[in-house]
A protein has these predicted regions:
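Fe(II)/2-oxoglutarate oxygenase catalytic core
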Residues: 1-146, 150-179
Length: 179
């Protein structure tokens, strides 16, 4: 399941700006999601991927579900590993800056009232998954927008890992978004 709005992008695209951000805003307003392949600046996506690949395994932790104090690890729901992007690296700072520019634009254009942003790398070993879910914490309405940026290179359909957006709880097929 997706939250009220979702933005999906893939690496190696044009620089961001009002054109891209305007398209995203229009899509969010019209459809509730925006899928934009190849829109992150290549320098940004390449730097993020390089940074992630040089990270030590210990920097990644099993992903959980829920927010404290209900946060838990549930390997039946998801078994990927995550590492928070804090801005300690140049790549992380640049990503957070890009996302902040998008946030500011969407706040002005759509009056969303977005006031915070958090981000992490998610690493999926072969066979790993994150099952169908609503991308929001139970009982909370604070997650308004989710961004998924694929950093994969040389992805093939056999690799799996598509994001599936469902329109509602009765939607069985969903809209598949490939990395």
């Amino acid at each position: 399941m997706c939250p009220d709005t979702l933005f999906v992008c893939s690496p190696h695209g044009e620089n961001s700006g009002d054109g891209l951000f305007g398209r995203i805003a229009d899509d969010l307003q019209d459809k509730g999601y925006s899928i934009n392949p190849a829109v992150l600046p290549a320098s940004l996506s390449d730097a993020l991927l390089a940074h992630m690949l040089q990270m030590q395994d210990e920097q990644f932790n099993p992903a959980g579900i829920g927010r404290e104090p209900r946060h838990m690890h549930n390997r039946f729901v998801r078994n990927d590993e995550i590492c928070w992007i804090t801005g300690e690296s140049t790549a992380g700072r640049n990503w957070l800056r890009w996302a902040a520019e998008l946030q500011t634009f969407l706040n002005r254009r759509l009056l969303l009232g977005l006031f915070s942003f958090e981000s992490h790398f998610a690493r999926y070993a072969p066979g790993a998954y994150y099952k169908r879910h609503l991308d929001a914490f139970r009982g909370d309405t604070n997650r308004v927008l989710s961004i998924v940026a694929y950093l994969n290179t040389d992805w093939a359909a056999a690799d799996g890992g598509e994001l599936v957006l469902y329109s509602d709880m009765t939607d069985r097929d969903g809209l598949r978004v490939s990395p």
